C-alpha cells in the first residue's frame, strides 16, 4: 500500500517536469528580442549623436577654412604637424568628422591669430591682419567656450577674469573677441543654414565679401536697406513701364475717337453744304416763277384797260 501511495507523487513530478522544460526556452527568446530592440535604439541614438556632433563641429572647420582663404595661407610639405591638417589638405569639401578637445583648442587659437598652426621653423605662423596681443594658455579653456557663446548669442562678449589676475589680459581678451565676433556670427549663421552634407558647404566669394564688410564695421541693415531700395526702384521702374503702356493705349483710343469725331463732322458739313446748294437752286426757281407771274399780271392789266377804253364796262374788275 505504501508503494501504491508513493507512486502518484512520482507521476505528478514526471507530469510537471515537461511543462518546466517547455517554458524554459521562452524566457531567453524574449530576452533576445528585447536585447535586439535595445541595440537598435542604441544604434539610432549613436547615429543621431554622430550627426549632431558633425553638424556642430562643421562650423569650426568652415570658419578655419574661410580664415585660411582670407589670409591667402598655403601649406607646404611635411613641416606641418597639426591635428587639423588632414582636413585642410584635402579637397575643398572634405568629409566632416567629430573633433577632439585638442582640435577645438587649435581652431580657436588659429582664429585669434595667437598660436601658429605649423611647428616647422621655415613656415610663418598664421596671423590675422588685425593681430592683437597674445592670450595666456591658462585662459584657453574658458576662452574657447566663451568665444563660442559670444558668437552664438548676439551682444557683448561674456568674459570673466577668474583665471587671469591681470586686468590688462582681460581687456585684451575682450577686445580680441569683440574684433572677431562679427566673423564668428557670420560663420555660425552660415553653417546652421547649410545641411550636414560636405558638398552643401557655403564657401563662396559672396559670403567672404559679406564677412569682410561685417569685419570692417559695415552695418548689415544698410545693405538690406540698399537691397530694399533697389527692389523698390525696380518695382517703380516696372510700374512706370506699366503706366506708360496704359497711357499709350489711352492716347491711341483718344486718337481713334477724335478721328471718328472729325469724320462725322466732315460728313455733316457736306450734308449741310448740299442742303444749301439745293435751297439756292430752289430759290432761283421760285424767283423765275415770280417773274413769270408778274409778267402775266401786267399783261392782264393791259388787256383790261384796253377793253375799258373801248366802252366795255366791267364792274367786277377793279384795278
From Swiss-Prot:
SMART domains: BRLZ
Major subcellular location class: nucleus
A single BP term in Gene Ontology: positive regulation of gene expression
InterPro entries in UniProt: AP-1_TF_bZIP, bZIP, bZIP_sf, Leuzip_Jun
Positions of the UniProt region annotated as Basic motif: 244-285
Span list, region Disordered: 1-52, 216-264
Assigned keywords, A-Z: DNA-binding, Nucleus, Transcription, Transcription regulation
Location within or outside the cell: Nucleus
Domain (bZIP): residue spans on this chain: 244-307
Phenotype upon loss of function: Sixty percent of animals display an egg laying defective phenotype. Animals display numerous defects in the reproductive system and have a reduced brood size.
Expressing tissues: Isoform a, isoform b, isoform c and isoform d are expressed in the spermatheca.
GO molecular function: DNA-binding transcription factor activity, RNA polymerase II-specific; RNA polymerase II cis-regulatory region sequence-specific DNA binding; RNA polymerase II-specific DNA-binding transcription factor binding; sequence-specific DNA binding
Biased composition (Low complexity): 8-19
Protein species of origin: Caenorhabditis elegans
Role of this protein: Transcription factor that recognizes and binds to the AP-1 non-canonical enhancer heptamer motif 5'-TTAGTCA-3'. Required for ovulation. Controls plc-1 expression in the spermatheca to regulate spermathecal valve dilation.
Protein name: Transcription factor jun-1
CDD domains: bZIP_Jun
Entry similarity comment: Belongs to the bZIP family. Jun subfamily.
Assembly: Heterodimer; with fos-1.
Ranges of biased composition (kind: Basic residues): 28-38
Amino acid at each position: 500500500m505504501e508503494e501504491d501511495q508513493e507512486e502518484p507523487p512520482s507521476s505528478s513530478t514526471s507530469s510537471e517536469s515537461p511543462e518546466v522544460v517547455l517554458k524554459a526556452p521562452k524566457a531567453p527568446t524574449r530576452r533576445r528580442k528585447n536585447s535586439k530592440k535595445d541595440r537598435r535604439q542604441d544604434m539610432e541614438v549613436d547615429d543621431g549623436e554622430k550627426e549632431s556632433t558633425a553638424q556642430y563641429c562643421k562650423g569650426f572647420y568652415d570658419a578655419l577654412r574661410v580664415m585660411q582663404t582670407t589670409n591667402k595661407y598655403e601649406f607646404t610639405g611635411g613641416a606641418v604637424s597639426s591635428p587639423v591638417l588632414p582636413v585642410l589638405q584635402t579637397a575643398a569639401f572634405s568629409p566632416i568628422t567629430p573633433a577632439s578637445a585638442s582640435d577645438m583648442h587649435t581652431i580657436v587659437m588659429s582664429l585669434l591669430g595667437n598660436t601658429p598652426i605649423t611647428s616647422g621653423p621655415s613656415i610663418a605662423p598664421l596671423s590675422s591682419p588685425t593681430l592683437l596681443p597674445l592670450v595666456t594658455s591658462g585662459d584657453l579653456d574658458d576662452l574657447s567656450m566663451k568665444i563660442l557663446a559670444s558668437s552664438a548669442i548676439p551682444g557683448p562678449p561674456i568674459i570673466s577674469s577668474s583665471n587671469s589676475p591681470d586686468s590688462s589680459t582681460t581687456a585684451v581678451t575682450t577686445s580680441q573677441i569683440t574684433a572677431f565676433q562679427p566673423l564668428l556670427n557670420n560663420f555660425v549663421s552660415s553653417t546652421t543654414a547649410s545641411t550636414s552634407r560636405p558638398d552643401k558647404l557655403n564657401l563662396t566669394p559672396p559670403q567672404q565679401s559679406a564677412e569682410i564688410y561685417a569685419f570692417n564695421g559695415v552695418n548689415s541693415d544698410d545693405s538690406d536697406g540698399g537691397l530694399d531700395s533697389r527692389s523698390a526702384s525696380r518695382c517703380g521702374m516696372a510700374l512706370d513701364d506699366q503706366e506708360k503702356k496704359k497711357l499709350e493705349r489711352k492716347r491711341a483710343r483718344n486718337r481713334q475717337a477724335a478721328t471718328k469725331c472729325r469724320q462725322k463732322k466732315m460728313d455733316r458739313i457736306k450734308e449741310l453744304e448740299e442742303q444749301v446748294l439745293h435751297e439756292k437752286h430752289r430759290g432761283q426757281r421760285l424767283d423765275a416763277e415770280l417773274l413769270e407771274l408778274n409778267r402775266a399780271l401786267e399783261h392782264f392789266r393791259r388787256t383790261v384797260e384796253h377793253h375799258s377804253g373801248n366802252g366795255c364796262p366791267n364792274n367786277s374788275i377793279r384795278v
